[in-house]
Amino acid sequence: MAPHKSDDVDAEAELASQLAADVAAAESSAATKAKASSASSSSTPAAERQPFSILDLSEPTRKAIDAMGFKTMTEVQARCIPPLMAGKDVLGAAQTGSGKTLSFLIPAIEMLHRLKFKPRNGTGAIIISPTRELALQIFGVAKELMAHHHQTFGIIMGGANRRAEADKLQKGVNLIVATPGRLLDHLQNTKGFVFSNLKALCIDEADRILEIGFEDEMRQIVKILPNDNRQSMLFSATQTTKVQDLARISLRPGPLYINVHADLAASTVSRLEQGYVVCESDRRFLLLFTFLKKNAGKKIIVFMSSCNSVKYHSDLLNFIDVPVLDLHGKQKQQKRTNTFFEYCNAPCGTLLCTDVAARGLDIPSVDWIIQFDPPDDPRDYIHRVGRTARAGNSGKSLLFLLPTELGFLRFLKVAKVPLNEYTFPSDKVANVQGQLEKLISKNYYLHQSARDGYRSYLQAYGSYSLKRIFDIHKLDLAKVAKAYGFSVPPKVNITIGTGLKTSASSSSGSGGKRKEVDVDGEGEDADGEINPKRQQSDRRAYYRKNHQNGGSKDHFRKSGANATGNKGGKQWSR
């Protein structure tokens, strides 16, 4: 967080957790790419868009917009910025990737400039974001927009150094980007945090904030913040009952409702080619492995349902020389930040993640979205695939479904999501099941990681709300276990209902369960720590065996090199 302009240059000062200098450099580069994507993503043809020059902007803001390379506004920007600059409250709904970040930042910054806010005046504008990564991204754009302004700005979020944040809040931060939990903490406990002069409150991705369990925090935040002459703006991709309730308590009566793209025939952009593949549980990893080998030069995001599943597949794929990055809610903040910006700046590569990366993030030039584990709701599907086909680019997505999950397609159809079925010849899928089971049985570290991933997959599956489609009783546990490298299902405990436990170790399904949720809305279910010495020993032993006997890692490397998948006879990797 940064109370003085000189402090705003480095992301590590803003994070107040002494992140490495290379992360700060990555943030600047990623923010530039993100804002370009945010500004240019729109269904409105460029020739029909209105220029930023028609807005009554201050010279510092105009210089910043010119330096950022923006000439025309997207539809959401053209419809939101003028009424917001006129002081109206706005309830906005728009497709993901429509460019709404500038829609709320420009009016907030102009307000601070017009009122000549200084550090001694405290905080005049607060932007609330559901996740740390999205908060970092918004902060990066704000930093460039405020490059020629004298007002101060900063970021406060979970995982950063709270004391350093408090010190800078006490010095005065005019514009704050924040996550809900840390913001409420400072509002309640930080002495000298001046927010009595607050003039603008923006709640971004409001539906996501509420979905991941911050409803109580948001109500407390709105209650604490002054509402006299406060302008509020609330952006949400979907207008749920909870979002409407939050809008009632946070917005002034009679807000302007702006719904961009409400009349479109599809909920996703036309440049996105979408498909699904029907695959039995025991073939899922083999197909994923084949796909990643075939598309090694592409930029791919793979969504999974739990932190432990992401961790296991990352451990396994990196071990067998399929390089991937991983991002999930159990990682420490520095690791999450490093990974996020590393992937943003990479020209190609694979990111395994939970839904922590599904909402709002502008990750440049993503070629493929793979939904290895289906989402719980069509809205989540739409936000996942929204990470590709941005800024006028094309993209592709692939949804993995079990035969018992085909009913989910009906929900996607109702949500105006067009999908084609993809097929793949079984003889083109890498047959590495034997090598996988041998590796998992002999490597203690991977065995433990696989067991945690298997258990978390079952727990997450039991937490689906669409239980008629995602019915844990219909899972063949023997086949699920094979996908995690087990010849026989391991015995694991999973939580059922409101706290009872059962063991799952047979080929029949287990009862449903309620997934515990952490601050990012992801399952938290670790059994314990792995002995790092045992891990290193296993790795050394395995490498020795490979070099001496041409072990199974070489087979993994060769398998899948020529594998293809077809959609109507065409290769996936066109």
From Swiss-Prot:
Annotated CDD domains: DEADc_DDX18, SF2_C_DEAD
Motif (DEAD box): 204-207
Domain Helicase ATP-binding positions: 81-257
Keyword Lipoprotein: no
UniProt entry keywords in alphabetical sequence: ATP-binding, Helicase, Hydrolase, Nucleotide-binding, Nucleus, Ribosome biogenesis, RNA-binding, rRNA processing
Motif (Bipartite nuclear localization signal): 283-299
Comp. bias (Low complexity): 31-47
Disordered: region residues: 31-53, 500-574
The Helicase C-terminal domain, residue ranges: 271-440
Cross-referenced Pfam families: CTE_SPB4, DEAD, Helicase_C
Biased composition (Basic and acidic residues): 530-541
Biased composition (Acidic residues): 519-528
Localization terms from the record: Nucleus, Nucleolus
GO molecular function annotations of the record: ATP binding; ATP hydrolysis activity; RNA binding; RNA helicase activity
Residues the entry annotates as binding ATP: A94, Q95, T96, G97, S98, G99, K100, T101
Catalysed reactions, semicolon-separated: ATP + H2O = ADP + phosphate + H(+)
Gene Ontology BP annotations: maturation of LSU-rRNA from tricistronic rRNA transcript (SSU-rRNA, 5.8S rRNA, LSU-rRNA)
EC number: 3.6.4.13
Root EC class: hydrolase
GO cellular component terms attached to this protein's record: nucleolus
Notes on the domains: The Q motif is unique to and characteristic of the DEAD box family of RNA helicases and controls ATP binding and hydrolysis.
Family (UniProt): Belongs to the DEAD box helicase family. DDX18/HAS1 subfamily.
Protein purpose: ATP-dependent RNA helicase involved in 40S ribosomal subunit biogenesis. Required for the processing and cleavage of 35S pre-rRNA at sites A0, A1, and A2, leading to mature 18S rRNA.
Quaternary structure annotation from Swiss-Prot or TrEMBL: Associates in the nucleolus with the 60S and pre-60S ribosomal subunits.
Designated name of the protein: ATP-dependent RNA helicase HAS1
Species of the source: Mycosarcoma maydis
